[in-house]
Amino acid sequence: MKLFFSFLFSLFYFISFAQEVAILKYKGGGDWYSNPTALPNLVKYCNDYIDTNINENIKTVEAGSTDIFQFPLLHMTGHGNVFFSDDDAENLRNYLVSGGFLHIDDNYGMEPYITKELKKVFPNSELIEIPKNHAIFSTAYNFPNGLPKIHEHDGKAPKAFGIFHESRLVLLFTLETDLGDGWEDEEVHNDPEEVREKALKMGANIVKYAFEN
């Protein structure tokens, strides 16, 4: 088993220089497939404006698959239920502590499910609010006030929570912002251009942070 995980770590170390992102598919019945144009649009924005060279063919990977180790950044979203099996949780934990990064964007209604399931991934860690002076808010574009507000749901302020491993932010949970809606094609939500621009810029920060840390 140790040899197996050593192999995975070596594999991840080798490919972490590649610029790849993927959508994380999970169990539980939640719509992991929501916002289908979001990640492709963010990738194109990053390639155009922050000098990345990300593969624009976005793949989908399952939480329990070793395929996740091919991607320095995983994106997860949805509105409803999330379930991680013990194998899923162990696989995600190994991925994250080996250098991977997971961005979870609550598309509205995901919070109570994902917070419970993350306790399986990191039983001894809590989601903590990320301070506004953290590097993720300034890697490519400055957001001195933290996350931008993209969509109104409950009228609450946007929040960024994270889990840290050995001082490195390995997981970002964005709540009450709906960044992914702002990344989607303009006609999907009819967001004003300046709102979509804020969402894409914050997304570019997340991508840049994940690739460089």
Where are the language model's segments positioned?
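Solvent-exposed loop/turn segments at secondary-structure junctions
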Residues: 26-30, 79-83, 101, 108-112, ...
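Short, surface-exposed beta-strand/loop micro-motifs that present aromatic residues
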Residues: 64, 155-171
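Aromatic-Pro/Gly-enriched surface loop or interdomain linker
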Residues: 17-73, 77-80, 176-179, 185-213
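Bacterial N-terminal signal peptides
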Residues: 6-13
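Positively charged n-region of N-terminal signal peptides that target proteins for export
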Residues: 1-4
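Acidic, glycine-rich loop-and-strand cores that form catalytic or ligand-binding grooves
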Residues: 116-147
